[in-house]
């Protein structure tokens, strides 16, 4: 029976992607409160650069900054993620996104389709809110009840489905945006019970955010980005819609009139409803606890570094069928290698899944011959959440050491991770990722998830 099922699902194919319309980012950011705040903060320091940055190196700042962008958005919120997990922290963020949409903010959510299965498929319920549009990138076929069945149903197209969209963007009004290593879920914000990620993001202001939005638009309008309603069956749509539109068991304050956004209000924890859940499987009490302890970041007072900037992004067709990414010169890795070749003194790499490959090893050999110091921090086997990636790294370990490269592998305890990076919103430590010392998980397992190259 298993073999017959696998053969039958193997014949599944994607529908024609004819239901999508082209759309682009909001094009007048300076007319919004966030855009005006960017200009005001720049004028305060008479900055020559037109982009600014704030490192989000703690779980608290990572969560509160996303809340601040949602709370202060007036025209648009564009989110692009590899994974959005249906848990308490996501419930808080989705409630705020829903409320923003109800006050007239246009929300576009682009997700890689690999993880929208099981409980995490509940995230798609947001599609049925006004002003919300969700697209799924590089989708798999088959039921969302099981990842196994979806993989089996796509085995005939394995060259395509094994390439995933790992971009992570969170953009408000095309004026402020967050990018970095974090997906959305408890493990990325230090509140998962069993395992948390040590991670790193940056909050960007100004012109560079336009580049981030342009990248979002390229993926959003790509032929591999499918509107949710193109992929879900009529029965799936009916079930999701019934769940999404069912009246809550009590009064739902979020369904009453919500006032329009005011220009950058002082940080305050907006109420999270204990009944009007977006994710039916998440405990309302857990979401309420998250909200009460993490108010939005104060955007008026956050420290900023104004500096020239360059955004490097892989093209969407890197994810498509075939080997388009083999064309040199147009990937993020190509850009990073070019920067490394010009390093005069020191290279520091933080990577959770460090598998250098032949071209990077050649670059390392060349710069080491010039006396450039190279240090690499990656996961140990114990801390790695992707053992296959560690196996790939282990094959290069002896050769890396022979080049004189200094290798550091993170241990798997939260105490180590907290000591490495600091747990408070103002603590930097070595600045290599977000501390998880504030997690409710105590001594639970920690895994490095930060991605950074310092040259």
Located regions from the model:
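Bacterial N-terminal signal peptides
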Residues: 1-8
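Charged, low-complexity intrinsically disordered terminal segments
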Residues: 10-168, 172-455
């Amino acid at each position: 029976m298993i073999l017959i099922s696998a053969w039958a699902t193997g014949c599944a194919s994607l529908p024609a992607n004819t239901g999508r319309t082209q759309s682009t980012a909001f094009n007048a950011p300076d007319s919004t409160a966030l855009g005006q705040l960017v200009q005001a903060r720049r004028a305060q320091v008479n900055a020559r650069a037109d982009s600014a940055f704030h490192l989000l190196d703690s779980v608290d700042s990572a969560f509160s900054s996303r809340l601040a962008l949602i709370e202060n958005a007036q025209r648009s919120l564009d989110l692009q993620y590899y994974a959005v997990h249906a848990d308490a922290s996501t419930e808080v963020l989705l409630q705020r996104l829903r409320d923003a949409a109800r006050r007239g903010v246009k929300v576009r959510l682009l997700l890689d389709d690999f993880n929208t299965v099981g409980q995490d498929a509940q995230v798609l319920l947001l599609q049925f809110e006004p002003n919300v549009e969700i697209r799924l990138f590089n989708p798999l076929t088959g039921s969302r009840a099981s990842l196994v069945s979806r993989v089996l149903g796509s085995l005939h197209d394995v060259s395509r489905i094994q390439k995933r969209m790992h971009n992570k963007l969170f953009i408000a009004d095309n004026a402020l945006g967050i990018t970095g290593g974090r997906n959305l879920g408890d493990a990325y914000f230090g509140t998962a019970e069993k395992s948390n990620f040590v991670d790193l993001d940056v909050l960007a202001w100004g012109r560079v955010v336009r580049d981030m939005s342009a990248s979002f638009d390229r993926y959003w309008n790509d032929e591999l980005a499918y509107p949710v309603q193109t992929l879900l069956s009529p029965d799936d749509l009916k079930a999701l819609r019934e769940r999404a539109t069912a009246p809550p068991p009590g009064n739902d304050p979020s369904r009453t009139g919500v006032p329009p956004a005011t220009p950058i209000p002082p940080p305050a924890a907006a109420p999270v409803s204990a009944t009007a859940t977006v994710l039916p499987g998440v405990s309302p009490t857990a979401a309420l606890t998250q909200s009460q302890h993490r108010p939005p970041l104060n955007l008026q007072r956050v420290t900023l570094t104004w500096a020239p900037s360059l955004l490097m992004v892989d093209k969407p067709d890197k994810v498509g069928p075939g080997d388009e990414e083999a064309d040199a010169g147009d990937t993020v890795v190509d850009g990073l290698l070019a920067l490394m070749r010009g390093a005069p003194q020191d290279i520091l790499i933080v990577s959770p899944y460090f598998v250098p490959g032949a071209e990077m090893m050649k670059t390392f050999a060349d710069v080491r011959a010039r006396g450039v110091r190279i240090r690499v921090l990656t996961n140990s086997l114990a801390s790695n959440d992707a053992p296959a990636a560690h196996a790939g790294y282990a094959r290069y370990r002896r050769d890396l050491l022979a080049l004189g490269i200094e290798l550091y592998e993170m241990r798997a305890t939260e105490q180590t991770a907290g000591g490495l990076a600091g747990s408070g919103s103002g603590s930097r430590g070595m600045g290599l990722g977000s501390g998880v010392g504030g997690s409710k998980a105590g001594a639970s397992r920690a895994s490095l998830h930060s991605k950074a190259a310092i040259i």
